[in-house]
From Swiss-Prot:
<keyword id="KW-0520">NAD</keyword>
<keyword id="KW-0285">Flavoprotein</keyword>
<keyword id="KW-0963">Cytoplasm</keyword>
<dbReference type="Pfam" id="PF01134">
    <property type="entry name" value="GIDA"/>
</dbReference>
<dbReference type="GO" id="GO:0005829">
    <property type="term" value="C:cytosol"/>
</dbReference>
<keyword id="KW-0521">NADP</keyword>
<keyword id="KW-0489">Methyltransferase</keyword>
<keyword id="KW-0808">Transferase</keyword>
<dbReference type="GO" id="GO:0047151">
    <property type="term" value="F:tRNA (uracil(54)-C5)-methyltransferase activity, 5,10-methylenetetrahydrofolate-dependent"/>
</dbReference>
<dbReference type="InterPro" id="IPR036188">
    <property type="entry name" value="FAD/NAD-bd_sf"/>
</dbReference>
<keyword id="KW-0819">tRNA processing</keyword>
<dbReference type="InterPro" id="IPR002218">
    <property type="entry name" value="MnmG-rel"/>
</dbReference>
<feature type="binding site">
    <location>
        <begin position="10"/>
        <end position="15"/>
    </location>
    <ligand>
        <name>FAD</name>
    </ligand>
</feature>
<dbReference type="InterPro" id="IPR004417">
    <property type="entry name" value="TrmFO"/>
</dbReference>
<dbReference type="GO" id="GO:0030488">
    <property type="term" value="P:tRNA methylation"/>
</dbReference>
<protein>
    <recommendedName>
        <fullName>Methylenetetrahydrofolate--tRNA-(uracil-5-)-methyltransferase TrmFO</fullName>
        <ecNumber>2.1.1.74</ecNumber>
    </recommendedName>
</protein>
<dbReference type="InterPro" id="IPR020595">
    <property type="entry name" value="MnmG-rel_CS"/>
</dbReference>
Length: 434
């Protein structure tokens, strides 16, 4: 057994998973958790992996990408998924848990491992030696300042302001056209033209739609230069037409005329399977958000893979800073995991901790860190956060749009998703003993 110790900072979903994966590989772990010495605005206990929002870990079926990532994690002995399975409550096709029992179970499994030493103190500096930073969206101010200094001000963020992302295959291409404003450079945007009547219908639905209530510690985010589209709309009907829906320079090639308003979609991934809705960061609830977006011509049947969100979230610009092993590019023995890396969601956070933990253990044991193929759910997430466009990087949930394309195109969605799942689980079998 190696005498080196790996520091893991944060005992949330990612940190708990990382600590467990390191410990079970015979490596000593020093797990730092500042609670209960210092609480966050969202936590209520000193337990590991406390779920601060929903008690659902989302879909549990293989027809959904997050169901696939769970199954991959089961195969790789995830402590988070094991505890969730043991503490599950009825939730249809989803995996929901008794949150108190779940946190207690994770705490028990991790804390009682002979290779784990828990240190209840707040770290304000990044330690030397092998370290995983998994401090989550509510990282303490002192450590956040250190991370900002490490990564550079331009690569460290304090909130999400993410526009919705849709699957390209679900866009009605007969209603949209490819063009850049004033034809500058290559045609890079899909444009959804609106008549005045279509815009009026969209506008009225937008300003009437229900928004998510802000938590007290989130109220400053709208003053950081990123306005939700519904707040812009509330300032007057023309605000959008002169803002994100500005039509000038975007003549419709079918008519030769400038539409009344235009919604632009920009490619979001290297494979060109996902498009984000430009300038549409929003705080609308997901149900109303879908109804409003489907009033946009061409998006009537759009499959939304990530809804627009605006909330407090400490994260880094992973495409510039991380490798798909979750290693920091400038320091091989420093890893990041969890929502701080730009993965979004309970399961995705734990999955990043699983891979970061495995790779930290491999590093101190003199083995090469592992890159999972992007045909797997875990590999596709690691690939997305490290290979996507750094300029417009925003956190992302697991979805099939991130997976490497299938060799053979399958038209029916259910069959296509099944093929993604089958290929992923066959591939992950090659990594279960790493």
């Amino acid at each position: 057994m190696t005498t080196q110790v790996v520091n893991v900072i944060g005992a949330g979903l990612a940190g708990s998973e990382a600590a467990y994966q390191i410990a079970k590989r015979g490596v000593q772990v020093r797990l730092y958790e500042m609670r209960p010495v210092r609480q966050t605005p969202a936590h209520h206990t000193d337990k590991f992996a406390e779920l601060v929002c929903s008690n659902s870990l989302r879909a549990n079926t293989l027809t959904n990408a997050v169901g696939v990532i769970k199954e991959e994690m089961r195969l790789m002995d995830s402590v988070i998924i094991r505890a969730a399975d043991e503490c599950s409550v009825p939730a249809g096709g989803a995996l929901a848990v008794d949150r108190h029992e779940f946190a207690a179970k994770v705490t028990e499994y991790v804390k009682n491992h002979p290779n784990v030493t828990v240190v209840n103190e707040e770290l304000t500096e990044i330690p030397e030696g092998p370290t995983i930073i998994a401090t989550g969206p509510l990282t303490s101010p002192d450590l956040a300042a250190q991370l900002k200094e490490l990564t550079g001000e331009d690569y460290f963020y304090f909130y999400d302001a993410a526009a919705p992302i849709v699957e390209k295959d679900s866009i009605d291409m007969n209603k949209v056209y490819l063009k850049s404003r004033y034809d500058k450079g290559e045609a890079a945007y899909l444009n959804c033209p609106m008549t005045e009547e279509e815009f009026d219908r969209f506008y009225e639905a937008l300003i009437a739609a229900e928004t998510v209530p802000l938590k007290e510690f989130e109220k400053e985010i709208f003053f950081e230069g990123c306005m939700p589209v519904e707040v812009m709309a509330s300032r007057g009907r023309q605000t959008l037409v002169f803002g994100p829906m500005k039509p000038v320079g975007l003549e419709d090639p079918k008519t030769g005329k400038t539409p009344y308003a235009v919604v632009q979609l920009r490619q979001d991934d290297a494979a060109g399977t996902l498009y984000n809705i430009v300038g549409f960061q929003t705080h609308l609830k997901w149900g109303p958000q879908k109804e409003v977006l489907q009033l946009i011509p061409g998006l009537e049947n759009a499959e939304i893979v990530r809804y627009g969100v605006m909330h407090r979230n400490t994260f880094i610009n992973s495409p510039n800073l991380l490798r798909p092993t979750y290693q920091y590019k400038q320091r091989d023995d420093l890893f990041f995991a969890g929502q701080m890396t730009g993965v979004e969601g309970y399961v995705e956070s734990a999955a990043s901790g699983l891979l970061a933990g495995i790779n930290a253990a491999r590093l101190v044991q003199g083995e090469e860190p592992v890159v999972l193929p992007s045909v797997t759910a875990m590999g596709s997430m690691a690939n997305y956060i490290t290979a996507t466009n750094a300029k417009n990087f925003q956190p992302m949930n697991a979805n099939f749009g991130l997976f490497a394309p299938l060799e053979k195109k399958i038209k029916k969605k259910a069959e296509r998703n099944e093929a993604y799942a089958t290929r992923a689980l066959e591939t992950i079998q090659n990594f279960v003993n790493i």
